[in-house]
C-alpha cells in the first residue's frame, strides 16, 4: 500500500451517498420483506437502486429481482412468493403496472417522487398536444424507459450533448426535428450532470425558440447537491475517489465531473477495490459517493486509508440533506388498474 503513504488529508463531500428517494425505496423493501415473510418472498421489478452491494444484501434476505414480470411465473413454480411486487426508485412504464395488476400482484410503488413528477409532466404535456424532447444518457436507462412509456407517441429521445453518438436511439440536440416546432417541451432524466443538462437545453432553445422549459427545480435536488459538493472540494484536492456502480447514472456523472475538475478521479464499488497506485504523490484526496451507495462502503475506504496513514486528517466538507419521502402504501390489483 506504499502509494498511499504520502496522504495527509481526506475531504469527504457532503452530501454524499443515499438520497431521500433511495432511503425510501430500500426501507420499503426491507420492511415489506420482513412483514410478508410468513406469506412468502418479495419480488422487486428492476434493481431497487443501481448498486450491486445493496442488491446483494437484499437478495441475502430472500428478495428476488426481475427485469421482466414474466419471470414471476417461473419464480412462483420454484419459490413461495408473497404475490407482491415492488417497483424500483427509477420509475416504470404504465404497461408494467397493468401487467402486474393482471397477474394479481399487490404493488408497492417505490418510484422516487421526483421521477413521478416528470412522469406527470409527460402525461400532461402530451395531453395538451405538445411534443416532448426527453433528454437522457441512454435509451436503456430505467428512468428513460419509464418516462417515455407515459407518452411514447409524443416523445422524442434526445442525447445530453456530451453523449451525442453514444446511443443511436437518442437524437442529436443540434439536429433533432419535431412535427410541430410551435408546441414542444423539454423534460430530462433526473440524474444527469446539471451543467450538461442546462447546456443541452440551451442548444434546444436556440433550435426551438418557443421551447417550453421546466423550472430548474425539475432537476433532482440530490443530483445537484452532490455535484456542487464535488465542485467545492475540487480546488483543495489532487485526486478524487467516487464510490459508485457503473450502472448508476448519477454516480458516473460525479466521476466525470471530478475527472474534469481534478484530472485524477477513480471509480470503485467496494473498499477492497482501492488501488495504491491511484494515490501516488497525492497529499489531499476528495471522496464522494453516488446517491445509491451505502455509507458503510465510504467508511470502509476511510478505514483502509487510516490504516496506512495513522495521522490522516479526515474533513467532512459541507452539509447533509434533511429531505425525507413517505414510504409507499400497498395497492391492490384493482387499485392499480383504476389508476393505470
Curated annotation (Swiss-Prot):
Note on how the cofactor is bound: Binds 1 [4Fe-4S] cluster per subunit.
Binding site for dimethylallyl diphosphate: 50, 90, 141, 248-250, 292
EC number: 1.17.7.4
EC class name: oxidoreductase
Residues at the active site: 143
Coiled coil: none
Positions bound to [4Fe-4S] cluster: 19, 112, 220
Name this polypeptide is given: 4-hydroxy-3-methylbut-2-enyl diphosphate reductase
Lineage: Bacteria, Thermotogati, Deinococcota, Deinococci, Thermales
Record gene name: ispH
Amino acid at each position: 500500500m506504499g502509494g498511499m503513504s504520502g496522504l495527509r488529508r481526506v475531504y469527504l463531500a457532503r452530501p454524499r451517498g443515499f438520497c431521500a428517494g433511495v432511503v425510501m425505496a430500500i426501507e420499503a423493501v426491507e420492511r415489506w420483506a420482513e412483514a410478508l415473510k410468513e406469506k412468502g418472498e418479495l419480488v422487486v421489478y428492476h434493481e431497487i437502486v443501481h448498486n450491486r452491494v445493496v442488491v446483494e444484501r437484499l437478495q441475502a434476505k430472500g428478495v428476488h429481482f426481475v427485469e421482466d414480470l414474466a419471470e414471476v411465473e417461473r419464480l412462483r413454480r420454484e419459490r413461495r412468493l408473497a404475490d407482491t411486487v415492488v417497483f424500483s426508485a427509477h420509475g416504470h412504464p404504465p404497461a408494467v403496472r397493468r401487467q402486474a395488476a393482471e397477474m394479481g400482484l399487490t404493488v408497492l410503488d417505490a418510484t422516487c417522487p421526483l421521477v413521478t413528477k416528470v412522469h406527470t409532466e409527460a402525461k400532461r404535456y402530451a395531453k395538451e398536444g405538445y411534443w416532448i424532447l426527453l433528454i437522457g444518457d441512454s435509451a436503456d436507462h430505467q428512468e428513460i424507459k419509464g418516462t417515455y412509456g407515459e407518452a411514447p407517441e409524443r416523445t422524442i429521445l434526445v442525447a445530453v450533448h456530451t453523449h451525442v453518438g453514444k446511443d443511436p436511439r437518442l437524437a442529436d440536440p443540434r439536429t433533432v426535428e419535431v412535427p410541430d416546432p410551435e408546441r414542444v417541451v423539454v423534460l430530462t432524466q433526473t440524474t444527469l450532470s446539471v451543467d450538461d443538462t442546462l447546456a443541452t437545453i440551451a442548444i434546444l432553445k436556440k433550435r426551438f425558440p418557443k421551447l417550453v422549459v421546466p423550472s430548474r427545480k425539475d432537476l433532482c435536488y440530490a443530483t445537484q447537491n452532490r455535484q456542487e459538493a464535488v465542485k467545492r472540494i475540487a480546488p483543495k484536492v489532487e485526486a478524487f475517489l467516487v464510490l459508485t456502480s457503473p450502472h448508476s447514472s448519477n454516480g458516473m456523472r460525479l466521476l466525470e465531473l471530478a475527472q474534469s475538475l481534478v484530472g485524477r478521479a477513480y471509480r470503485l464499488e467496494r473498499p477492497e477495490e482501492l488501488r495504491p497506485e491511484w494515490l501516488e504523490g497525492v497529499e489531499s484526496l476528495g471522496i464522494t459517493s453516488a446517491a445509491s451507495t451505502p455509507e458503510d462502503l465510504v467508511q470502509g475506504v476511510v478505514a483502509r486509508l487510516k490504516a496506512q496513514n495513522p495521522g490522516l486528517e479526515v474533513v467532512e466538507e459541507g452539509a447533509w440533506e434533511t429531505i425525507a419521502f413517505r414510504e409507499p402504501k400497498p395497492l391492490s390489483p384493482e387499485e392499480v388498474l383504476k389508476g393505470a
